[in-house]
């Protein structure tokens, strides 16, 4: 039987021990901060990136991994005897990473199936972890692809931002529907769906977030949940408040992690994401 390996990109928010245990390959995006280039994989320490962003003269710029890095990654895996590679990447609404991955696979002439997760962060982790567990257990390529698609179709990702400033500066505001860019200091909750960020609610103060969450949970209380994760940018207190509210509906463990530099660059401080995978 062949060996299948899972590749993803560093926009994923995942526990380091899971990457190691499941032998997941993470290809890093890059972040430019005041003319200094950082590999995203070197900015994973809690609070490290945010302190750099706060001290920077201008908004950091993120860039997708070079095509050559993907080609090299795939060539190295093939040299190790890997017979199939499944590459799961963040939504093309957020980055051109998926196209770089496809081009790298072509250059390497490697057996790579490149998938659009439709998401990023821990919502992408749901797919990556399941695929890696299945690969380790000896599942076939088709079984893994079917499982990933099923998870994708049952996942929802919601982002709350405390300011639209970074989205405007980073040029992402054009990809957010239904938002006036002049309202920089409103709290906004958006859904990432079908590779588009769609505004759900706008308001002042953190009550905007908790009110939205309470309404969402009540409306969906009849749907059995497979897993929930929360990510945050900066201070964890709001994420922990949201976790407490979710716990009333879901009595299993909830992963709460700081999101990475790629997401923080665009959302700014005080943002969060709630990601739900339904059964």
From Swiss-Prot:
Keyword Nucleotide-binding: no
Chain residues that bind heptadecanoate: 62, 95
Keyword DNA-binding attributed: no
Example GO molecular function: lipid binding
Ranges for domain DegV: 4-278
Oligomeric form and interacting partners: Monomer.
Record function comment: Binds long-chain fatty acids, such as palmitate, and may play a role in lipid transport or fatty acid metabolism.
Alphabetized InterPro entries for the sequence: DegV, DegV_C, DegV_domain_contain
Name of the protein in its database record: DegV domain-containing protein SPy_1493/M5005_Spy1226
Keywords assigned: Lipid-binding
């Amino acid at each position: 039987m062949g060996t299948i390996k899972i590749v993803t990109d560093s926009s994923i928010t995942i526990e380091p021990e899971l990457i190691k245990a499941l032998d997941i390959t993470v290809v890093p995006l890059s972040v430019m901060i005041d003319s200094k280039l950082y590999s995203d994989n070197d900015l994973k320490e809690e609070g490290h990136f945010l302190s750099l962003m706060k001290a920077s003269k201008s908004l950091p710029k993120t860039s997708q991994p070079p095509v050559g890095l993907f080609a090299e990654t795939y060539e190295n895996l093939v040299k190790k005897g890997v017979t199939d590679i499944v590459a799961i990447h963040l939504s093309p609404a957020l980055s051109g990473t998926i196209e770089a991955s496809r081009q790298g696979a072509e250059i390497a002439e490697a057996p790579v199936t490149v998938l659009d997760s439709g998401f990023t962060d821990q919502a992408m982790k749901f797919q990556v972890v399941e695929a890696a567990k299945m690969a380790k257990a000896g599942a076939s390529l088709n079984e893994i692809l079917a499982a990933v698609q099923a998870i994708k179709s049952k996942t929802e990702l919601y982002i709350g931002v405390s300011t639209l400033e970074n989205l405007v500066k980073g040029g992402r505001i054009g990809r957010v529907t239904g938002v006036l860019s002049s309202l920089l200091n409103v709290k906004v909750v958006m859904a990432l769906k079908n590779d588009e960020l769609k505004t759900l609610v706008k308001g002042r103060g953190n009550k905007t977030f908790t009110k939205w969450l309470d309404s969402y949970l009540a409306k969906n209380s009849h749907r059995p949940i497979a897993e929930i994760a929360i990510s945050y940018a900066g201070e964890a207190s709001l994420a922990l408040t949201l976790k407490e509210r979710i716990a009333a509906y879901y009595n299993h463990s909830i992963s709460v992690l700081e999101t990475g530099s790629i997401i923080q660059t665009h959302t700014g401080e005080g943002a969060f994401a709630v990601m739900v995978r339904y059964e």
